[in-house]
């Protein structure tokens, strides 16, 4: 069973210590109540991962741990087989002792679009909401973050993260907690808060933006990435049923509307720094994610539309600063 004791000990000595009033009970309840049928199998796979000195670790330009020479052929096949227990791998990629985990998403491309526009992460406390397998947590550590905390309720993402951390020498600069943002108290402690690919899944986008704000210290930075449509300040797409075969898509604003929402929630210096059409090179089926992917969600006769006839996925990156309360 995954143990969060190291995280408790870590935050007891820093600005997140007040989180200990609620967090241990929440995670104890999660461990007790989580009934995902595959969790025992994933835990067994985690426990079977061999101890291998990480040696070379590269987190700045990519996530690469160790080298192919660190493992013999038989051991490498064993490790790859164990890592495949955690399929589908959606967010990455990762390279572990010469094993390339080719994930569905090229999350490194998103990072390359975001990084030039954000404040330097060196020495910062960072929160990544909806962090998936934690790929971007490692890139944040690679940029010098003092502590990178990710939250995502998926037990599979937690196990994927712990598998990578195992090979990274149990690095304690990054942590993933199986929680949703609605379960966090108003910590007001992070220098930077990321929410990437989450807003359109929320029934109340304004509430989500306010929840993000409540995690930031005064003058902290919000990095918000989400689906957008073309249009003016009052244009918002609300799918009648599905968007790209996803049922849980609620609001897709124009970039102008998104900017207004964030300003109304008490942020200043709000700016859209990037817009990008998602391509089938960035999101695609791979040997590590064999289910449907973006090409299956687009109209086969017109890739500018989803199969439902909505505009194809376009993503914007917004940066903002929390005004003082």
UniProtKB/Swiss-Prot annotation:
<dbReference type="InterPro" id="IPR029063">
    <property type="entry name" value="SAM-dependent_MTases_sf"/>
</dbReference>
<feature type="binding site">
    <location>
        <position position="130"/>
    </location>
    <ligand>
        <name>carboxy-S-adenosyl-L-methionine</name>
    </ligand>
</feature>
<feature type="binding site">
    <location>
        <position position="105"/>
    </location>
    <ligand>
        <name>carboxy-S-adenosyl-L-methionine</name>
    </ligand>
</feature>
<keyword id="KW-0808">Transferase</keyword>
<feature type="binding site">
    <location>
        <position position="200"/>
    </location>
    <ligand>
        <name>carboxy-S-adenosyl-L-methionine</name>
    </ligand>
</feature>
<comment type="subunit">
    <text>Homotetramer.</text>
</comment>
<dbReference type="Pfam" id="PF08003">
    <property type="entry name" value="Methyltransf_9"/>
</dbReference>
<feature type="binding site">
    <location>
        <position position="196"/>
    </location>
    <ligand>
        <name>carboxy-S-adenosyl-L-methionine</name>
    </ligand>
</feature>
<comment type="similarity">
    <text>Belongs to the class I-like SAM-binding methyltransferase superfamily. CmoB family.</text>
</comment>
<protein>
    <recommendedName>
        <fullName>tRNA U34 carboxymethyltransferase</fullName>
        <ecNumber>2.5.1.-</ecNumber>
    </recommendedName>
</protein>
<feature type="binding site">
    <location>
        <begin position="152"/>
        <end position="154"/>
    </location>
    <ligand>
        <name>carboxy-S-adenosyl-L-methionine</name>
    </ligand>
</feature>
<dbReference type="InterPro" id="IPR027555">
    <property type="entry name" value="Mo5U34_MeTrfas-like"/>
</dbReference>
<keyword id="KW-0819">tRNA processing</keyword>
<feature type="binding site">
    <location>
        <position position="91"/>
    </location>
    <ligand>
        <name>carboxy-S-adenosyl-L-methionine</name>
    </ligand>
</feature>
<dbReference type="GO" id="GO:0016765">
    <property type="term" value="F:transferase activity, transferring alkyl or aryl (other than methyl) groups"/>
</dbReference>
<feature type="binding site">
    <location>
        <position position="110"/>
    </location>
    <ligand>
        <name>carboxy-S-adenosyl-L-methionine</name>
    </ligand>
</feature>
<comment type="function">
    <text>Catalyzes carboxymethyl transfer from carboxy-S-adenosyl-L-methionine (Cx-SAM) to 5-hydroxyuridine (ho5U) to form 5-carboxymethoxyuridine (cmo5U) at position 34 in tRNAs.</text>
</comment>
<feature type="binding site">
    <location>
        <position position="315"/>
    </location>
    <ligand>
        <name>carboxy-S-adenosyl-L-methionine</name>
    </ligand>
</feature>
<dbReference type="GO" id="GO:0002098">
    <property type="term" value="P:tRNA wobble uridine modification"/>
</dbReference>
<dbReference type="InterPro" id="IPR010017">
    <property type="entry name" value="CmoB"/>
</dbReference>
<dbReference type="GO" id="GO:0008168">
    <property type="term" value="F:methyltransferase activity"/>
</dbReference>
